[in-house]
Swiss-Prot record:
PANTHER family: IMPORTIN BETA. Residues 358-381 have a biased composition (Low complexity). One of its GO terms (cellular component) is nucleus. Keywords: Cytoplasm, Nucleus, Protein transport, Repeat, Transport. Its main location: cytoplasm. It comes from Dictyostelium discoideum. The gene is tnpo. Forms a complex with an importin alpha subunit. Coiled coil: none annotated. This is Transportin. Functions in nuclear protein import via a substrate-importin alpha-beta transport complex that passes though the nuclear pore complexes (NPC). Mediates docking of the substrate-importin complex to distinct nucleoporins. GO terms for biological process: protein import into nucleus. InterPro entries: ARM-like (IPR011989), ARM-type_fold (IPR016024), Importin-beta_N (IPR001494), Importin_beta (IPR040122). It comes from the Eukaryota. It is found in: Cytoplasm; Nucleus envelope.
Length: 931
């Protein structure tokens, strides 16, 4: 192939355009973008970029932009590039690895990495030998460029490097990288270590056979003069502990001793990575035996790590700052918490018990087991500036992505995790005396503050062992709420929230009154951080104390109203959460004129002051949702005000959606539009829960049935979840007004019975069940399609408990609609159905489900026979059935007993003894009742 020759006029034109990138003008950048778009029609456009990028006689910013545009083009258009252009880039880019400009070398590394992502090593056979050879060069620039490139390849192409595609390059590469552990250049040592560390999890054979040399190399760098090297030594050891601890076990005592030393390193980055080791090893098998002897040394180190540094104090201690407006970057975006019907939330995740004490903002949490924050990120990634900004994270090799994670937080987390591993008596015998010493009033306030943080950190893991001490600890903490230092008051609020469970129990009940009084005082503190911590702590107390707070309602509401006049934007979000949590736990107790007259006016004032496009309206609507649900009819004429505003918000947001939809991507929606729709739908649901069937009078004068259908046709999981939840509630109270759209609703609901979107699936299933028992004729044509999806879901036994319960209820209700369509398949789901429904609280939903299941089983008793023990277990889960339902199942069970004749006794004796006792008592299965 003839050598490529550029057109000089075209080259000059492109250089001119790239040179404009030095401008700070947005208009100029738009012009650059337009001009570069025109170049895409030139087949060898990327050859020009490559040529400009490698030309060291050009100005650095021109070369830099050429390289970044080339990288972007490879990411987006590589497959469309002519093969000769691809080959030209590969051939010409490698020599630039020795460029004296480090930023140019790093751009080369990113280009190479993206080329391999888009193809493979076998299509560029010269690459790895060239990089390997470069490591033997006398040029420091070439070695650095090659090591940097290899670190990116090891991170992004781990599997490709350990494959035939690369010619098993790791067999040569890993030993050579280990040799760099001894070189004089600290940056080279670091890059070599980082590169190999990416293979620890996959553990290729090339690393396995060199593991002894690798470990010796790591240990040889443990006292490295470079902070960056020591940081990555600690990071590598943490990765080994987390994933391959067996390789460290022969050296584990030395490793632990080293980490004890490194956790106190003068370098904050080294100390932070070392501190992560304690959480990692705490989760390893047999960790108690490994760590037991070191607790007396480790715990003091961790406690010291929890003390605020002077820099922290200067940044955080803002004194009386309640009148200082929040900066926009201080305010987290509000995420609407959309409702998931059922007794279990959609997440079903295990709570580790540790809550970040330095981030008390729970405003995005409705603190409700029935609420699931369904954060559907409709991010419209704007890549307009990607060509001019190297925002790729390819070269982020420092390993620290979360700037907010500190030694203080890591130490507190380790203290927390350790408390759950060791027996309470053993752990507290070491920890409590140290904490008590630090609580002494003679100590500097940062030391006392760290002791209070430690008390909060161990609250859950050492719960039983701490109980005898709480009668002394809690009064101390309540008194400390009045400490002159804001950071002490703040952490005390958090720690008390960790013990609110005990205060709500009989043993701690005497402390409820002083806690409420003092915590309310802190809610209106003059320091914003204290306000935040106190408000969050009070929301936690509300959940634990529940109805015990009823005597304090007036005092609480007066404080909340005072806070409205004092809080800046960020803390208002937390205040809304505390109000909605209170409304949830005390329920209709709020429906008293004297309480309504305190709480509602400030909420109403804000409701009227905010226009429909103001995002500050979103958290307010979330708060009103629960307030309306609890107060209900007591809102009187405000009910129609809230209802009509919600309808208006939905209409406006849908119009904005359709406008956006016509202008941009079909089927997508602005996340802002969907946020308002979700908040308005949820407020309507709160109203319906509060006033019940009275909401029917509002429907005829609105177009809610059609609006709801439009919302259900949107794609966002959050808006679907809220739409389905509202439809379920409307089905309970006034379904007749929605009748004309039932077939459309059911089509959409059926198509969303997929557990990949758990809360959407959950609410769809529940809504179908609510419609089924009220309009069975309309549901009947859909039974077969719904049945198939629900049977599939009920057999996914690892699904969230609430989802399984709702699925079981809806299957049972479909049995009322059309038992003949369900009964032939009873053998496929009855066992899982029984296991799900037996855990459900006795209520009207469970009642209707059992009525439908009775019809299903009666239609096909033989199909259910081999699962009779599960049926009996489910029936026995009732405390008290309705008389007619009891009679039906009494006869059903005795029908099975009679049909089995002489084998019944042998079969029945295989039932668990406790189950037989219940069945004998309630259903007389041990007696002959034949006449």
């Amino acid at each position: 192939m003839s050598e490529w020759v550029p057109n000089q006029d075209g080259l000059k034109q492109l250089v001119y355009v790239l040179n404009l990138s030095n401008s700070t003008s947005r208009e100029v950048h738009d012009q650059i973008r337009e001009e570069l778009d025109k170049f895409h029609s030139v087949p060898d456009y990327n050859n020009y970029l490559t040529l400009i990028f490698k030309s060291n006689e050009l100005q650095p910013h021109i070369r830099s932009v050429a390289g970044l545009v080339l990288k972007t083009n490879i990411k987006q258009y590589f497959e469309k590039m002519p093969r000769e252009v691809q080959n030209y880039i590969k051939r010409e880019i490698l020599p630039v690895l020795s460029d004296p400009d480090a930023s140019v070398r790093h751009t080369v590394g990113n280009i190479i990495t993206n080329l391999i992502k888009k193809s493979c090593f076998s299509e560029w056979p010269e690459l790895l030998p060239a990089l390997n050879l470069a490591l033997d060069s006398n040029s420091q620039d070439l070695i650095e460029g090659s090591l940097y490139t290899l670190s990116l390849l090891c991170e992004d192409s781990t599997k490709k490097l350990d494959s035939d595609d690369s010619g098993r390059a790791l067999n040569q590469l890993i030993p050579k990288l280990i040799m760099f552990f001894k070189c004089n250049n600290a940056d080279f040592r670091k890059k070599a270590l980082v590169s190999i560390s990416y293979f620890i999890i996959s553990m290729p054979g090339a690393l396995l056979i060199n593991m002894e040399a690798f470990l010796k190399g790591i240990f040889s760098m443990s006292e490295d003069p470079s902070e960056a090297v020591r940081t990555n030594v600690c990071k590598t050891l943490v990765t080994l502990v987390e994933t391959k601890i067996e390789f460290l076990l022969p050296y584990i005592k030395d490793v632990i001793q080293y980490m004890l030393h490194a956790t106190k390193d003068k370098s904050e980055e080294v100390a932070l990575e070392a501190c992560e080791f304690w959480t990692a090893i705490s989760q390893a098998e047999g960790c108690r035996d490994l760590l037991r002897d070191y607790l007396p040394v480790l715990v003091p180190i961790l406690l010291n790590g929890m003390v605020y540094t002077e820099q922290d104090y200067e940044y955080l201690d803002q004194g009386d700052d309640s009148m200082t407006p929040d900066r926009p970057q201080d305010i987290k975006p509000f995420i609407a918490s959309t409702k998931s019907h059922g007794s279990g939330s959609s997440g079903g995740g295990q709570d580790t018990g540790f809550v970040n004490p330095d981030n008390n903002n729970n405003s995005n949490n409705n603190n409700s087991s029935n609420n699931n924050s369904s954060n559907n990120n409709n991010n419209n990634n704007n890549e307009d500036d990607e060509e001019y900004n190297d925002d790729d994270d390819d070269d982020d090799d420092d390993g620290f992505e979360d700037e907010a994670w500190t030694i203080r937080k890591s130490s507190a987390f380790a203290i927390d995790v350790l408390s759950g591993i060791f027996p309470d008596a053993e752990y507290l015998s070491v920890t409590l005396p140290l904490i008590e010493q630090r609580m002494n009033e003679q100590n500097p306030w940062p030391v006392r503050e760290s002791a209070i943080l430690a008390l909060g950190a161990i609250a859950d893991g050492s719960k039983n062992g701490l109980a005898p001490h709480l009668s002394k600890v809690i009064p101390y903490l309540i008194n400390t709420l009045n400490d002159p230092k804001p950071l002490v008051r703040s952490i005390t609020c958090w720690t008390l929230s960790r013990y609110s469970y005990w205060i709500a129990q009989a043993d701690g009940r005497d402390y409820l009154h002083p806690l409420v009084v003092n915590l309310l005082n802190r809610i209106v503190d003059n320091n914003k951080k204290v306000q935040e911590a106190a408000c969050s702590a009070f929301a936690t107390l509300e959940e634990e104390a529940d109805l015990l707070l009823i005597p304090y309602l007036q005092m609480i509401l007066v404080t909340f109203v005072n806070a409205f006049g004092k809080y800046q934007a960020k803390n208002l979000l937390i205040l809304y959460d505390a109000i909605s949590t209170l409304a949830k736990v005390v329920g209709n107790e709020l429906n008293k004129p004297e309480l309504i007259n305190i709480l509602v006016p400030p909420l109403l004032q804000k409701f009227n002051a905010l226009d429909d496009s103001n995002k500050n309206l979103l958290p307010l609507l979330g708060c009103l949702n629960q307030v309306c649900s609890s107060i209900g009819a007591g809102l009187q004429n405000l009910i129609s005000l809230f209802f009509n505003r919600s309808i208006k918000l939905i209409e406006g947001s849908l119009q904005a959606h359709y406008k956006y939809n016509n202008q941009d991507q079909k089927g997508s929606s602005s996340s802002s539009d969907q946020d308002f729709i979700v908040a308005a739908l949820d407020l309507l649901q709160g109203l319906s829960e509060g006033i019940g069937t009275s909401i029917e009078s509002l429907i005829p004068n609105s177009n809610l049935p059609h609006l709801l259908l439009q919302c259900m046709n949107l794609r966002g999981s959050d808006v679907l979840q809220s739409s389905f939840a509202l439809l379920g509630d409307m089905s309970k109270f006034c379904l007749i007004h929605f009748k004309q759209y039932i077939p459309d609703y059911l089509n959409i609901l059926t198509n969303n019975l997929y557990p990949e979107y758990l809360s959407v699936c959950n609410n769809a299933s529940w809504a179908i069940g609510e419609i089924a028992i009220r309009m069975p004729d309309e549901v009947k044509p859909f039974v077969v399609a719904i049945r198939d999806r629900l049977i599939s879901n009920i057999n996914k036994v690892n699904l969230n408990r609430g989802v399984l319960e709702n699925t079981a209820v809806t299957i049972g209700r479909l049995g009322i609609v059309s038992p003949a369509d369900i009964s032939p398949f009873v053998d496929k789901f009855i066992q899982c159905w029984c296991m799900a429904i037996r855990r459900k609280t006795d209520d009207i939903e469970k009642d209707s489900a059992f009525r439908g299941m009775w019809l299903i089983i009666n239609n096909n008793p033989n199909g259910a026979l081999r699962h009779l023990v599960y049926i009996c277990d489910a029936v026995a889960s009732w405390d008290k059935m309705q008389p007619d339902l009891y009679e039906a199942y009494f006869k059903l069970l005795h029908m099975y007993k009679t049909s089995m004749g002489g084998v019944w006794a042998q079969f029945y004796n295989q039932f668990p003894e406790q189950l037989r006792e219940i069945l004998n008592e309630k259903f007389k299965l041990n007696q002959d009742i034949s006449q």
